Swiss-Prot record:
Subcellular location: Cell inner membrane
Alphabetical keyword list: Antiport, Cell inner membrane, Cell membrane, Ion transport, Membrane, Sodium, Sodium transport, Transmembrane, Transmembrane helix, Transport
Free-text function comment from the UniProt entry: Na(+)/H(+) antiporter that extrudes sodium in exchange for external protons. Can also transport lithium.
Recorded effect of pH on activity: Optimum pH is 8.5-9.0. Inactive at pH 7.0 or 7.5.
Highest taxon in the source lineage: Bacteria
Gene this protein is translated from: nhaD
InterPro entries cross-referenced by the UniProt entry: Cit_transptr-like_dom, Na(+)/H(+)_antiporter_NhaD, NhaD-like
Spans through the membrane: 6-26, 39-59, 77-97, 120-140, 162-182, 203-223, 224-244, 289-309, 327-347, 364-384, 392-412
Lineage: Bacteria, Pseudomonadati, Pseudomonadota, Gammaproteobacteria, Vibrionales
Entry protein name: Na(+)/H(+) antiporter NhaD
Entry's Gene Ontology cellular component terms: plasma membrane
GO terms (BP aspect): sodium ion transport
Topological type in the membrane: Multi-pass membrane protein
Length: 414
């Protein structure tokens, strides 16, 4: 069952209860104002993620990820090098792309090179999940939880950078220990040539420009970052228009070169070129995920209005030390999806220092690495490497993953 279905139903039931209860006390205006507030929060998140997903889909359609995958597969790396390379790239790419896309890309490389070695696949997938979650924790563009903290205004964009070292430690410590169990042999090399489609590199530059625009709107104009992201979507739309208008000239030029070189394969490939369509990229966004976020926002917002989150907040952030409360948020993120957990914390809005907001951002972001079901990356990889990367295969390494947290607390709290 898709994850959006139960939360959409739950959101509807909660707000029916709210509507009935507040009507009994003649406070329909209070319920309506709360509903509109939650809808606005969701709209900002929806449009922001829609633009980011559209850019990722555009890069995928232009064969950027396929080219990276072919390069890695064709290099003939040994298992140990492949283990470190896929993990390192997951850590580096996830702050720009989202951690789910990054994890799936690296998993595809692992499966193509060593799909017949289940022990290595399991270790490599665990490593990728840890790296992708850790890499996404120090960038608002790498993880939904980090994005929500930034959009809420608790931490400025530049203030996330102190999370880089703790995130790196959180990845490197378990990776170093797991690498000891990776075989020293080499898998069979597969050579595959992938040609980038026209405009691939320029779309990457436009995505970087879009990120800069979103940050500028937030830092300089004090507008929500989503306004800058929507402007960035216009960059892609105009570039898509340019690609379509110049397609005929580009094909004629490439066809002439193919004829001159006697390359029949290139001519055949040119005949199947499909014009770039931005709106098709929009339609291929992860709509189940986007609808899931709606359910989460509305469920948590409803429970907050009914007073349940205030009770939890009084226990966690009044009776407990905020540091340990935030550590528990990370542990809870391993069992429950980290998005509703973080949104609940943001809705509670406890009075905390910037250091504690950074701590809860890190723990919620990387806490999901403790279990395979704790993050979208882990769940997706269990499907991509079905039967080889499993819940219990990941669970065996949970104590090792937890060691990555030990050096992190003093760094953040200090």
């Amino acid at each position: 069952m898709r994850k959006s279905k139960p939360v959409l139903l739950a959101a509807g039931l909660i707000w029916i209860l709210i509507g009935y209860t507040f009507a009994q006390h003649h406070q329909q205006d209070v319920a309506k104002a709360a509903l509109e507030h939650n809808l606005l929060e969701y709209a900002e998140l929806l449009l922001f993620l829609l633009v980011a997903m559209t850019y990722i889909n555009a890069m995928e359609e232009r064969k950027l990820f396929d080219a990276l995958q072919a390069w890695m597969v064709g290099k003939g790396f040994g298992f140990k090098k492949l283990f470190w390379l896929t993990g390192f790239l997951a850590f580096v790419i996830s702050p720009i792309a989202d951690n789910l896309t990054t994890a799936l890309l690296m998993c595809a490389v692992v499966m193509k090179v060593s799909g017949d070695n289940p022990r290595f696949v399991n270790l490599a997938c665990i490593n990728i999940v840890i790296a992708a979650n850790a890499g996404g924790a120090f960038s608002p563009f790498g993880d939904i939880t980090t994005l929500m903290v930034w959009q809420a205004g608790h931490v400025r964009f530049s203030e996330f950078m102190p999370l880089f070292v703790p995130s790196l430690i959180n990845y490197v410590v378990p990776a170093f220990l797991m690498a000891l169990f990776v075989p020293n042999t080499k898998p069979n090399t597969i050579h595959e040539h992938v040609e980038l489609k026209r405009g691939a590199r320029r779309i990457v530059l436009l995505f970087v420009l879009t990120i800069a625009t979103a940050v500028s709107f937030h830092a300089v104009l004090h507008f929500p970052p989503v306004v800058g992201m929507m402007m960035g979507l216009a960059y892609l739309q105009f570039f898509g228009y340019f690609l379509r208008k110049t397609l005929k000239h580009s094909l004629a030029k490439k066809a002439a070169m193919a004829i001159a070189n006697g390359d029949d394969h290139a001519l055949k490939r040119l005949g199947s070129v499909v014009p770039f369509d931005v709106f098709h990229r929009v339609s291929r966004a992860e709509w189940d995920t986007l609808l899931f976020f709606y359910g989460v926002v509305m469920c948590v917002g409803g429970l907050s209005l009914l007073g349940y989150l205030e009770l939890v907040s009084n226990v966690m952030y009044t009776q407990w030390n905020p540091v340990w409360a935030n550590v528990m948020v990370g542990v809870l993120s391993a069992i429950v999806d980290n998005i509703p957990v973080m949104f609940a914390v943001l809705t509670m809005d406890p009075s905390m220092s910037t250091g504690n907001w950074l701590l809860v951002t890190l723990t919620a972001g990387v806490g999901g690495s403790l279990l395979s079901i704790g993050s979208a990356a882990g769940v997706a990889l269990m499907g991509a490497a079905r039967g080889q990367y499993t819940f219990f295969g990941h669970l065996k390494w949970t104590p090792v993953i937890a060691l990555g947290y030990a050096p992190v607390l003093p760094l953040i709290c200090g």
